[in-house]
Amino acid sequence: MKRSLRKMWRPGEKKEPQGVVYEDVPDDTEDFKESLKVVFEGSAYGLQNFNKQKKLKRCDDMDTFFLHYAAAEGQIELMEKITRDSSLEVLHEMDDYGNTPLHCAVEKNQIESVKFLLSRGANPNLRNFNMMAPLHIAVQGMNNEVMKVLLEHRTIDVNLEGENGNTAVIIACTTNNSEALQILLKKGAKPCKSNKWGCFPIHQAAFSGSKECMEIILRFGEEHGYSRQLHINFMNNGKATPLHLAVQNGDLEMIKMCLDNGAQIDPVEKGRCTAIHFAATQGATEIVKLMISSYSGSVDIVNTTDGCHETMLHRASLFDHHELADYLISVGADINKIDSEGRSPLILATASASWNIVNLLLSKGAQVDIKDNFGRNFLHLTVQQPYGLKNLRPEFMQMQQIKELVMDEDNDGCTPLHYACRQGGPGSVNNLLGFNVSIHSKSKDKKSPLHFAASYGRINTCQRLLQDISDTRLLNEGDLHGMTPLHLAAKNGHDKVVQLLLKKGALFLSDHNGWTALHHASMGGYTQTMKVILDTNLKCTDRLDEDGNTALHFAAREGHAKAVALLLSHNADIVLNKQQASFLHLALHNKRKEVVLTIIRSKRWDECLKIFSHNSPGNKCPITEMIEYLPECMKVLLDFCMLHSTEDKSCRDYYIEYNFKYLQCPLEFTKKTPTQDVIYEPLTALNAMVQNNRIELLNHPVCKEYLLMKWLAYGFRAHMMNLGSYCLGLIPMTILVVNIKPGMAFNSTGIINETSDHSEILDTTNSYLIKTCMILVFLSSIFGYCKEAGQIFQQKRNYFMDISNVLEWIIYTTGIIFVLPLFVEIPAHLQWQCGAIAVYFYWMNFLLYLQRFENCGIFIVMLEVILKTLLRSTVVFIFLLLAFGLSFYILLNLQDPFSSPLLSIIQTFSMMLGDINYRESFLEPYLRNELAHPVLSFAQLVSFTIFVPIVLMNLLIGLAVGDIAEVQKHASLKRIAMQVELHTSLEKKLPLWFLRKVDQKSTIVYPNKPRSGGMLFHIFCFLFCTGEIRQEIPNADKSLEMEILKQKYRLKDLTFLLEKQHELIKLIIQKMEIISETEDDDSHCSFQDRFKKEQMEQRNSRWNTVLRAVKAKTHHLEP
């Protein structure tokens, strides 16, 4: 309530009422404005009348709010009224910032309000959300009279800690409130109490430049036994003295005051820096002079070191404070002092590009042969900087000591010329070469300066190095790894450097790994560099490394699609490496999608597809590997196998040609003898799709048409023949069961003998039919035995993994036993039991034959899944049957269905299916008083009803529904997998001549015409298809792709044009003798590197300096 009212009344804000407006409801906003007006007018009587008239419901909240404003405005009468009508807690209520009324009064310097609030019991030690107590606010705001009133209160804590542990004394020193500091010290405030950083009041006074406060603190400490020298050298948690903080502030008068009071210069803080090091870092020459002149110790303060063993001269050199450096040298600073990294001031200044200091030190005779921990001298670091040796005065370049450094090597064996070539400063390179430096000098890894220049793309430097050579030894020298400058330039994509080296006579050599320059360029995907190399030497595309890899292998493995396309267009040879992998295998195994798509779209796709080893275990046919690793690329390949005619899609003559060349290997491979241990299954691609669950590929129109072609060619006929042979046993067996009365035996004389004592004469009209059926059942069973034996010979171990084969053996065995009385006499009961088993499994196995048909096959699959779920839950069924069956046997054993344990369990199973038979088993025996234990019997019935019909059955239904949903989700995969399995098994059995006759490489389909196929095709459509035979894939919209391609070529043309203009402008600059920064910019980056660099940082064009130079020259030439 309070916060909403405060937000509502702010200067300059006028808010309109929003939302729903209620009529006949008093407006609190107007009441608040009126009450606030009373506060500012200072009328207690008016506020009292207002409260009586309005009858505010939240009087305490309103009074708390008003008390803050009344205290800030000094309205004592209102404060009396509010505090009289409220509890004591109103004095300690806080606003949004944690301020109490006392805070508000102190902040506004309302002395009377402070006295009134303290007299009413306000706590002066409460802190707001910024950890500021009223005393802190008074000291900080220079409200010393209010502070005096607060200090007179008996409960005031004069040493109370505020924000960051600062006491009122520290705050007084921060604000230079000397009057408040004196009063606080008189009231017992402790000047030795530090804050959370360990800073005492004297530290804060030194940092804030509060000279009066520092004098008061020092005098107070001196009066209490602390000498000024001891006090002025107190340290905080960072071991910093007041002098350190005074130097950080840069107040010369405060520093002088610290020194006059005995501040020591040599103490070091945690960073091992003295106060004078701080001054040297800031370049404060006057402060350094003051501190050096006032130092009277025995230590050489000018050359004292910090934690890094750096002197003041090192610090001045780091930030190019040349005036301070000149003064330090004049007072005896050691110009050759070494820090912890072995750097002298000269080396440190050179590394920091402090050229004023560098020239100063050289003029003072600094040693130039000192090396840092990396073995670099001053000249190594000089050539690394922009403009290099141009930053030094000309007379220094003539010094013999500097000339002797040009062949000096660092820890890696690199001379200054190596550094200059790596940095790309043509001016520095020219100066160094002017000292007769050998361009054949090698580093420890056998790299010459040309290696560095080529590696970093310094084309101007390369031109300068190759300008005066008389042989090509420098061009073709290899480093420690056998890499020539050509290798390094190609590896980093510097196409212009590669072109220069080739023009100068660089050879296409291989490094120690067998990699050529083309290998390195293809690994990085630098197509421009590759074009330069290929334009010079076309045969280098077929060079192999030690592992048998070509440049194609490298580009494909790294995923550089454009590089692969370039090599293929230049007729690069497609070979296998020592691991029997082609470049297509490497792209597939590394899942380089763009590379594979590029290969598919290339003119050499068929050639790439054929290159693989049949004996390689890890690098199989590219089609199967594509299905396994990159199915989306296989989908693109299948899209290319659909050729649409040029007619309109609505035209009757519109057709689609489906090409099946990628879905099955040649028939010869599937019929090979296992002499070479290379045998391919039929439908290799489709089987791979099934194994890897590639449902999106199996549902592709090309795959569907391929299966349809196989089905119409031989699948339907073969399956109908198989089904017909099975029906030769199924139908006669069914006729026998229907026409022969169970319990009667048929003998060879044609007499049916009843199992009872009397006999009947066989009806002669049916005897011949029964004999014929028995003979057919017998013959079909014998034929089934032969078929199963053949399958055992063909499938071997896999035959015993299929449970349907067990059903076949049971069917044929029980069928023969059932018709065996045709030849010999057998007991009638055995005959009819086998007949019951045979006819049961005959019809159950018939369902498995119907799996091949889509219309009913999916439901049979669902039945199998539900059956598996039931079998998994059999354990729960068994225990429940035993529990309730044995319990009912004890309670209901007088009834026939529960008279034995076995009968009781069977009856319980029947009850589980819903046949509870409550009336006969429970109600009537209870009414006749025949239940031995009625209460327990009914309790057990209720428990059985809850557990079995309700809980268990619902559980099974839920599992079945879940399984059905899962089956429906993968119905297409299962359906097509069955078709693939059928055709695979059939092709294994069919002869090669037949397959050649019926197999088709492609087929043409007219979507707008009815398919021809006669009765056979229509029967197939009725039994096999549930919906549309095919789903067309719409033609991809090529317009966007074509526009992007056009823009790509336009950008290439613009890039070429800009490069020409770039070269032209450089020539103009040279002719006009304009000097600009671009002359020292010897960098050549590939497009990829430039793009990455532009993404990381945005900077102005380097031609801005050229334009400025042109304008300056123009102004100079004007009269």
Swiss-Prot record:
Residues 1-718, 794-798, 851-862, 961-1119 are cytoplasmic. It comes from the Eukaryota. It holds the Pfam family Ank_2. The record marks K620 as: Required for C-621 reactivity. The record marks M634, T646 as: Important residue for activation by the scorpion wasabi receptor toxin. The modification Cysteine sulfenic acid (-SOH) is found at C633, C856. Changing C621 to A/S: Do not exhibit detectable current upon electrophile stimulation. No change in answer to hyperoxia and diallyl disulfide. Do not exhibit detectable currents upon stimulation with agonist JT010. Ca(2+) binds at E788, Q791, N805, E808. Changing D915A: Abolishes zinc influx. Abolishes activation by extracellular but not by intracellular zinc. Disulfide bonds join C192-C665, C462-C665, C608-C621, C621-C665, C633-C856. Residues 740-767, 824-829, 893-901, 923-933 are extracellular. Changing F909 to A/T: Loss of inhibition by A-967079, AP-18, and ASD. Increase in activation by cinnamaldehyde, AITC and acrolein. Residues 1042-1071 form a coiled coil. ANK repeats lie at residues 62-92, 97-126, 130-160, 164-193, 197-226, 238-267, 271-301, 308-337, 341-370, 374-403, 412-441, 445-474, 481-510, 513-542, 547-576, 579-609. The record marks C665 as: Important for electrophile activation. SMART domains: ANK. One of its GO terms (biological process) is response to xenobiotic stimulus. Keywords: ANK repeat, Calcium, Calcium channel, Calcium transport, Cell membrane, Coiled coil, Disease variant, Disulfide bond, Glycoprotein, Hydroxylation, Ion channel, Ion transport, Membrane, Oxidation, Repeat, Sensory transduction, Transmembrane, Transmembrane helix, Transport. The modification 4-hydroxyproline is found at P394. C-terminal helices from the four subunits associate to form atypical coiled coil structure; this region is probably involved in binding the inositol polyphosphates that are required for optimal channel activity (in vitro). This is Transient receptor potential cation channel subfamily A member 1. It comes from Homo sapiens. The lineage of its organism: Eukaryota, Metazoa, Chordata, Craniata, Vertebrata.
